[in-house]
Amino acid sequence: PSLWRAFSARILGAEYTFHHLPGVFSAGKVDPASLLLLEALQERLGPEGVRGRQVLDLGAGYGALTLPLARMGAEVVGVEDDLASVLSLQKGLEANALKAQALHSDVDEALTEEARFDIIVTNPPFHVGGAVILDVAQAFVDVAAARLRPGGVFFLVSNPFLKYEPLLEEKFGAFQTLKVAEYKVL
C-alpha cells in the first residue's frame, strides 16, 4: 500500500488537493494559522497583490501557503528542511498544476547568495517534542531581514503566547499586528 495520503481544502475561494507522507506537520488538514496568514496577506495586499512578485515561503511544509500563493500568480520558492514535506510539496504542486520551487534546505542554505524577495511568509514551527523552542523562528526572522527587498513585506503567523514582537522590532524597526484570533499575524 502507498504511504501517500491526500485531502482537499478550499482556501480563499479555490479548491486544492494536498498530498502528504506520514509525519508531515498538519497532515490531513490545513493549519488554521496558515489560513489566517493568507487572509491577512490578501486583505493587506489585495487579491492581485502577489501576482508576478517573488515570494519566499520559509518552512513550506506540504504547501499550505505555497500552493495558494502560486495560484494567485506569485513566483514562489518554498524552502523546507524535512524531506518528506518537500516531497509532499512537490506532489501537491503537480496535482494542482501549479508552478513553484520546492527546495530541501536548512532555512535558506539552498538559495543563492543574491536571492531577494518581495514577500516572505512563514508559519514557523515552535515545538520540539513537548518543549517550546523559538530557535527556528529566530532563524526565519533573521533570513527574512536579510532576504527581503526594500519595500518588501514579511508575514509571520504564530500563537499569541509566543513573543516575537521584540525580535521583529529589533530586525525590522516597525511592524504591525494584522489579525488576532486564536493566532496572530505579524
Annotate the PLM regions:
Residues 78, 156, 177:
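Conserved SAM-binding loop
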Residues 119-131:
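A short SAM/SAH-binding and catalytic strip from SAM-dependent methyltransferases
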